[in-house]
Regions:
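Basic, amphipathic alpha-helical patches used to engage nucleic acids or provide basic targeting signals
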Residues: 13-18, 42-106
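Solvent-exposed, charged helical/coil patches
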Residues: 1-36, 79, 91-94, 107-115
Protein backbone atom coordinates (compact mmCIF):
# COMPACT_ATOMS: atom_id res chain seq x y z
CA UNK A 1 0.00 0.00 0.00
CA UNK A 2 1.38 3.39 -1.01
CA UNK A 3 1.87 6.05 1.64
CA UNK A 4 1.85 8.85 -0.95
CA UNK A 5 -1.85 9.77 -0.48
CA UNK A 6 -1.42 10.11 3.29
CA UNK A 7 1.73 12.19 2.86
CA UNK A 8 -0.10 14.53 0.48
CA UNK A 9 -3.02 14.80 2.90
CA UNK A 10 -0.65 15.52 5.79
CA UNK A 11 1.13 18.21 3.78
CA UNK A 12 -2.19 19.87 2.92
CA UNK A 13 -3.29 19.71 6.57
CA UNK A 14 -0.02 21.35 7.71
CA UNK A 15 -0.79 24.28 5.41
CA UNK A 16 -4.29 24.82 6.80
CA UNK A 17 -4.28 24.24 10.56
CA UNK A 18 -7.20 25.20 12.75
CA UNK A 19 -6.64 28.06 15.18
CA UNK A 20 -6.34 25.55 18.01
CA UNK A 21 -3.85 23.37 16.11
CA UNK A 22 -1.75 26.47 15.42
CA UNK A 23 -1.80 27.43 19.13
CA UNK A 24 -0.81 23.94 20.18
CA UNK A 25 1.90 23.68 17.52
CA UNK A 26 3.40 26.99 18.65
CA UNK A 27 3.73 25.52 22.17
CA UNK A 28 5.09 22.12 21.03
CA UNK A 29 7.45 23.01 18.19
CA UNK A 30 11.21 23.39 18.53
CA UNK A 31 11.29 21.13 21.62
CA UNK A 32 9.62 23.84 23.73
CA UNK A 33 7.72 21.35 25.87
CA UNK A 34 10.11 19.43 28.10
CA UNK A 35 12.66 19.08 25.32
CA UNK A 36 10.47 16.56 23.48
CA UNK A 37 10.43 16.64 19.68
CA UNK A 38 6.93 16.75 18.22
CA UNK A 39 5.95 16.54 14.58
CA UNK A 40 2.65 17.75 13.20
CA UNK A 41 0.25 16.15 10.75
CA UNK A 42 2.30 12.97 10.51
CA UNK A 43 1.10 9.83 8.70
CA UNK A 44 1.04 6.79 10.98
CA UNK A 45 -0.26 3.70 9.25
CA UNK A 46 -3.53 4.58 7.58
CA UNK A 47 -4.08 7.66 9.75
CA UNK A 48 -2.64 11.17 10.06
CA UNK A 49 -1.84 12.23 13.63
CA UNK A 50 -2.23 15.91 14.50
CA UNK A 51 0.94 15.81 16.64
CA UNK A 52 3.28 12.96 17.50
CA UNK A 53 6.33 12.54 19.68
CA UNK A 54 7.91 9.46 18.13
CA UNK A 55 10.47 9.12 20.92
CA UNK A 56 7.67 8.65 23.49
CA UNK A 57 5.16 7.08 21.03
CA UNK A 58 2.69 9.75 22.09
CA UNK A 59 -0.01 11.15 19.81
CA UNK A 60 -1.87 14.37 20.62
CA UNK A 61 -5.12 15.12 18.82
CA UNK A 62 -6.83 18.51 18.68
CA UNK A 63 -10.42 17.65 17.92
CA UNK A 64 -13.41 19.47 16.65
CA UNK A 65 -16.90 18.02 17.09
CA UNK A 66 -16.55 15.44 14.30
CA UNK A 67 -13.38 13.68 15.46
CA UNK A 68 -13.62 13.44 19.23
CA UNK A 69 -15.27 10.00 19.26
CA UNK A 70 -12.96 8.05 16.96
CA UNK A 71 -12.64 4.76 18.82
CA UNK A 72 -11.57 2.58 15.88
CA UNK A 73 -8.71 4.92 15.04
CA UNK A 74 -7.55 5.13 18.66
CA UNK A 75 -7.76 1.35 19.05
CA UNK A 76 -5.56 0.83 15.98
CA UNK A 77 -3.00 3.37 17.19
CA UNK A 78 -2.91 1.84 20.68
CA UNK A 79 -2.58 -1.66 19.23
CA UNK A 80 0.48 -0.36 17.39
CA UNK A 81 2.13 0.95 20.55
CA UNK A 82 1.00 4.59 20.67
CA UNK A 83 -0.65 6.45 23.52
CA UNK A 84 -3.32 8.87 22.35
CA UNK A 85 -4.32 12.08 24.11
CA UNK A 86 -7.37 13.92 22.79
CA UNK A 87 -8.30 17.50 23.54
CA UNK A 88 -11.30 19.40 22.23
CA UNK A 89 -10.78 22.75 20.56
CA UNK A 90 -12.60 24.29 23.53
CA UNK A 91 -10.16 22.71 26.01
CA UNK A 92 -7.23 24.12 24.04
CA UNK A 93 -8.76 27.60 23.83
CA UNK A 94 -9.84 27.76 27.47
CA UNK A 95 -6.88 26.09 29.13
CA UNK A 96 -3.79 25.69 26.97
CA UNK A 97 -1.59 25.53 30.08
CA UNK A 98 -3.63 22.59 31.42
CA UNK A 99 -3.42 20.83 28.05
CA UNK A 100 0.35 21.29 27.94
CA UNK A 101 0.70 20.02 31.52
CA UNK A 102 -1.23 16.86 30.59
CA UNK A 103 0.93 16.32 27.50
CA UNK A 104 4.12 16.82 29.50
CA UNK A 105 2.95 14.37 32.17
CA UNK A 106 2.16 11.76 29.52
CA UNK A 107 5.48 12.29 27.72
CA UNK A 108 7.66 12.17 30.82
CA UNK A 109 9.45 8.86 31.34
CA UNK A 110 7.84 6.73 34.01
CA UNK A 111 10.04 6.39 37.07
CA UNK A 112 10.29 3.20 39.05
CA UNK A 113 9.15 3.45 42.64
CA UNK A 114 11.82 3.02 45.29
CA UNK A 115 11.33 0.14 47.75
Amino acid sequence: MSHAPKRLLAKRMRRTPTVQEAQLWHALRDRKLGGFKFRRQTPIGRYVADFVCLERRLIVEADGPFHFDDGERDAWLRANGYRVLRFTNQEIEAGLDNVLAAILAAAAPKRALSP
